[in-house]
Structures are given as structure tokens and as C-alpha cells.
């Protein structure tokens, strides 16, 4: 790498000739690069955020439907409702790893729009469910259709943005998942006013309205999402040139666009992937337990009415949305992931201890706010962390797929441990997972620090390099994000 005096700074008036040297010798003017990133944000992030909002809304609306009469109309026992919640993840997790490996082959705009149309139709037809087994079937189908959506969005973000830019962009998605909880509660509250004489139960209209909105939104992806962000139609020639420079500067991180079984196998030999999966499982169990069952916790455990439970869940989700944005923004600015995950989890620990230690409704309601603080940022930052530290593309795609598959197994468990009120088993399990997740994040942080030190010692000639081959994130000049 050249020194700062030797680097060529590319400003608006400068054109790039590859024959002049390597892209590593080129630094884009900061103001111009910031303008490019803002343009990418304005085009891509509203699309991704709205669509992830809708996917989370369609997935989690069973919690709101239960509060407004689904369980009574279908005559569901507590174990049947829990099973219906959990079974979604049985098919959801099977779709994740194949999706991140196939999305490049079929093109993101076709692949993602097909997913959206699929889950929209399943959501709409859920309004006709009249017994337990038909509800289970729709949940299984919904899992198949939604399974690869979030991992593919995460992968697309890693293709478009630099490592230090990714946390904030994933935060946008999680902000929307927070507000889907709040929005779902408000919709459910409004639908309690629709008379049953309209031909459908109140919860049936919930599925129809949300499914139709999702179906229409599929057109946005189909016609507006570029398969390759560096050649997007919304970029002018100068911006495409800058995207090419950014891509070349990240070549070790991105790697070859062709599928490589070697990188697939290397992912499974990497300790980072396994630690990331443990963290994801633990944080996802808390996320799915609270995001799905919060209205039921407020109604059945804290004793509030159905209407009050829906209203009172809104500010809890809103706090989670604010938290994920602020924490991920700070994480990007400091380029630190691990300490934020570890530190935020202490709020969750305090919240679950309160829920387990007292039956006072006011104290328990305050505890839900403490739990909301780390609920979304810890999940978002762990995904960003593994995205940042796995390279090239197909090693990262494999690790991300496994991360999401293992993480979403927690959805199956959450539905079983949050089976019936009082939810002491669920809260205890979530407390234990928070402890394990915190300890694993601490171990991963120090492991990465140690690996960075080893690489630097090899570069300094202080240690013999025992690896015969180094590529991607194993390269000596690839510095792990802590």
C-alpha cells in the first residue's frame, strides 16, 4: 500500500485509468464518496426497510391475531398456539442457506420479488383458516416463502457498502421490524371495531390487509432493484466509476462472483462462524419471544385488557427502534461491534430479572422497556459482525446462511418456552440465553483481537506463518473488526 503522499486522490474532475496502477493507490474524495453513499441510501434503504417491515409484520401478526380472537375462533389450546408459532421456523430455517447461495444466480430482483409474492398470497389466504391444522399448514408455507428474504438483504448490503458502513444500514431494517410490532398492534386495535357480520372474523381482515400491501410492494423490487448496484440505472457515469473503485478496493472482501466450493468448506472450518451462530441463537430467542408474545405478556401476565395491551406494546417497540438506530450508528462510527453487544445485554439481564422476581404490573412493564433496549441492536450488530469478518463472498454467504439458520432455530424454541401464562419458563430461558450470548460475544471479541495480533506479528517478522495459503479474511492485511 502506498503512503498518503503517494496515493492518488480522485476528485470530481479526475477520471480513472486502470493502467495507471492499482485501485489500492486511489483515494476517493470524502465529500464525493459521502454523496454517493447518500444516494445509495435514498434509493435502496427505503425499499429494503419497507419490505422488511412488511415481512416481519406478516410473520409476527399471529401474535396480534391471537389477542383479537384467533385462539378463541379456532378453539386453540395453549400448546397448539405455541406449536403454530414455532412451526413457521421449521421451514424458514431450511430456506435461508440455499437462498443466499442462489440469489446471485437468479438475480436479486427476480428472486426477492418471487419471495414477496409467495408470502403475500399465503398471508391473504390465512384469513380462511378455520381449524388448527390449516393454520399449521399456512405457517409452514409462510416460512418457506420468507426464509431467505432477510439473509439476501443482508448479503446485498455487504455487496454495496463498505464494512464500516454496514451496521447503520442493517439498523434501518431492524428499526422497521420494531415499528412493525407497533404498527401491527395499532392495526389489530382498529380491526377490533369491524363487526363480525362483515363475513370474516376481525383477525381475518388483519391478514387480508397486510397481505395485499405486501403483494403490491413486490412490484417495487421487481422493477427498481438493480442486480448489480455498481451498474444501477439511478447512478450517473461518474458515480458508476466511483462504485467500480470502491468494489476494487474491497476485492479481498468481495472475492470472485463465481461459486467456490473451497470457500464453502472454509466457512465450516472457521471458529468465527460457530461463535456467531451461538450469539445469534441466544439473541434471536429473546427477540422472537418478546416480539411475538409481548401483547400476550401484557394481557395475560400483567393483567391489562386486549385493547390496552395493544396500545401499551407500541412505545416498547418504538424504544427498540430508537435503540437499534442509535447503537448501530455509534457502532459504525467507532467501528466496534463486540463491546456494544456485550454492554447492551446488561439492560436485558436487568429486565428479565425484574420479570422473574416480582409480580408488580408497573415494575414488569418497566422491565419490558429495559429488554427492548438490546432486543434489536444486539441481533443487528452480530449479523454485521460476521458480515464484516468473513471474506470472500461465498465464504461470507455460507457463514451468513448458517448464522441465520441457527439463529432462527430459536424461533422454534421461543414458541415452546413461551407456551402459557405466567411466562416464567420463557423469561428464565431468555435470561439464560442473554448470559450465554454475552459470554460468547466476549470470547469472540478477544479471539478476533488475538488473531489480529498474530497477523501483525507475522507481518513484522516476529512469528512464523504456519498457514500454507491465506486468502479472503485469512489474508495478513485483512484486519478483523472487533
Swiss-Prot record:
Gene Ontology CC annotation, any one: plasma membrane
Transmembrane segments: 40-57, 83-103, 109-129, 140-160, 170-190, 205-225, 278-298, 311-331, 338-358, 366-386, 399-418, 428-448
Similarity field: Belongs to the major facilitator superfamily. Allantoate permease family.
Primary location group: endoplasmic reticulum
Protein name: Uncharacterized transporter C1683.12
Location(s), subcellular: Endoplasmic reticulum; Membrane
Source organism per UniProt: Schizosaccharomyces pombe (strain 972 / ATCC 24843) (Fission yeast)
Alphabetic keyword roster: Endoplasmic reticulum, Membrane, Transmembrane, Transmembrane helix, Transport
GO biological process: carboxylic acid transmembrane transport
PROSITE patterns: MFS
GO molecular function, one term: carboxylic acid transmembrane transporter activity
InterPro entries assigned to the protein according to its UniProt record, in alphabetical order: MFS (IPR011701), MFS_dom (IPR020846), MFS_trans_sf (IPR036259)
Gene3D superfamilies: MFS general substrate transporter like domains
Pfam family, one: MFS_1
Membrane topology note: Multi-pass membrane protein
Amino acid at each position: 500500500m502506498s503512503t498518503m503522499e503517494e496515493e492518488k486522490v480522485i476528485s470530481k474532475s479526475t477520471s480513472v485509468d486502470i493502467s495507471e496502477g492499482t485501485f489500492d493507490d486511489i483515494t476517493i474524495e470524502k465529500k464525493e464518496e459521502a454523496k454517493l453513499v447518500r444516494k445509495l441510501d435514498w434509493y435502496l434503504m427505503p425499499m429494503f426497510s419497507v419490505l422488511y417491515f412488511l415481512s416481519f409484520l406478516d410473520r409476527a401478526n399471529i401474535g396480534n391475531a391471537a389477542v383479537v380472537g384467533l385462539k378463541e375462533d379456532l378453539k386453540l389450546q395453549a400448546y397448539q398456539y405455541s406449536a403454530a408459532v414455532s412451526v413457521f421456523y421449521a421451514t424458514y430455517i431450511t430456506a435461508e442457506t440455499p437462498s443466499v447461495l442462489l440469489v446471485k444466480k437468479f438475480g436479486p430482483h427476480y428472486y426477492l420479488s418471487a419471495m414477496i409474492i409467495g408470502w403475500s398470497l399465503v398471508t391473504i389466504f390465512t384469513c380462511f383458516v378455520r381449524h388448527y391444522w390449516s393454520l399449521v399448514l399456512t405457517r409452514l408455507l409462510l416460512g418457506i416463502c420468507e426464509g431467505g428474504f432477510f439473509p439476501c438483504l443482508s448479503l446485498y448490503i455487504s455487496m454495496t457498502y463498505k464494512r464500516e458502513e454496514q451496521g447503520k444500514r442493517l439498523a434501518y431494517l431492524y428499526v422497521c421490524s420494531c415499528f412493525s410490532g407497533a404498527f401491527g398492534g395499532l392495526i389489530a386495535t382498529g380491526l377490533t371495531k369491524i363487526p363480525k357480520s362483515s363475513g370474516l372474523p376481525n383477525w381475518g381482515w388483519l391478514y387480508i390487509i397486510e397481505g395485499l400491501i405486501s403483494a403490491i410492494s413486490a412490484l417495487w423490487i421487481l422493477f427498481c432493484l438493480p442486480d448489480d448496484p455498481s451498474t444501477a440505472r439511478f447512478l450517473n457515469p461518474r458515480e458508476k466509476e466511483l462504485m467500480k473503485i470502491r468494489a476494487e478496493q474491497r476485492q479481498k472482501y468481495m472475492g470472485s462472483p463465481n461459486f467456490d466450493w473451497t470457500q464453502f468448506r472454509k466457512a465450516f472450518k472457521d471458529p468465527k462462524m460457530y461463535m456467531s451462530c451461538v450469539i445469534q441463537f441466544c439473541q434471536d430467542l429473546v427477540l422472537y419471544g418478546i416480539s411475538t408474545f409481548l401483547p400476550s405478556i401484557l394481557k395475560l401476565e400483567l393483567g391489562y385488557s386486549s385493547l390496552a395491551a395493544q396500545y401499551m406494546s407500541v412505545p416498547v417497540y418504538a424504544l427498540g427502534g430508537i435503540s437499534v438506530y442509535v447503537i448501530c450508528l455509534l457502532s459504525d462510527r467507532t467501528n466496534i461491534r463486540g463491546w456494544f453487544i456485550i454492554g447492551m445485554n446488561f439492560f436485558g439481564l436487568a429486565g428479565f430479572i425484574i420479570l422473574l422476581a416480582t409480580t408488580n404490573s408497573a415494575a414488569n412493564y418497566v422491565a419490558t422497556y429495559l429488554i427492548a433496549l438490546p432486543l434489536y441492536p444486539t441481533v443487528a450488530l452480530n449479523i454485521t459482525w460476521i458480515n464484516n469478518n468473513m471474506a470472500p463472498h461465498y465464504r461470507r454467504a455460507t457463514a451468513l446462511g448458517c448464522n441465520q439458520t441457527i439463529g432462527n432455530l430459536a424461533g422454534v424454541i421461543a414458541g415452546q418456552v413461551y407456551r402459557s401464562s405466567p411466562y416464567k419458563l420463557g423469561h428464565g430461558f431468555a435470561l439464560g440465553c442473554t448470559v450465554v450470548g454475552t459470554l460468547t460475544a466476549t470470547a469472540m471479541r478477544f479471539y478476533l483481537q488475538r488473531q489480529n495480533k498474530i497477523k501483525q506479528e507475522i507481518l513484522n517478522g516476529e512469528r512464523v506463518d504456519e498457514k500454507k495459503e491465506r486468502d479472503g479474511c485469512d489474508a495478513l492485511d485483512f484486519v478483523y473488526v472487533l
